[in-house]
Amino acid sequence: RDQGRNVLFLFDSITRFAEAHRETALLAGETPALNAFPPSTVRVIAELAERTGPGTEGKGDITAIYSVLVAGSDMEEPVADMIRGILDGHIILSREIAERGRYPAIDILRSVSHSLPHAASDDENVLIRDARRMLALYEEVSPMLRANLYGSGPRNRTISGA
């Protein structure tokens, strides 16, 4: 970046990085806090994330993609929770979506981008909001659709129109 170039930084995996930091911090005498993670783990991950992003005028940018390993799809797990609080957004990959054969298996309803509303036009943001609403409605009624319990009605016309 200091040479004025744009950089793509791929980090696999921030979970293993946090676990390694936990081990060294505990060996150094730090006391565990968040599910055995010392408080310095949040600081170290935040420092790593802050080094990426836009550079100063005339310098390059660093776009970062961090992978987070989540045991049993538990998004409340300490490292996943830390990352969600630090980064500008996250893309959740879903095993269930992959099993249905949809790739990339991105769970659109659980994924978040804090910068997208500023990057899209007002019309695009309306389309995105409407698409997410329709997808949420479909996800809500999909068990009834699979069980063939779907009936006609004003709400169901919205579903079939999606």
Indicate residue ranges for each PLM-predicted region.
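P-loop NTPase catalytic core
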Residues: 1-162
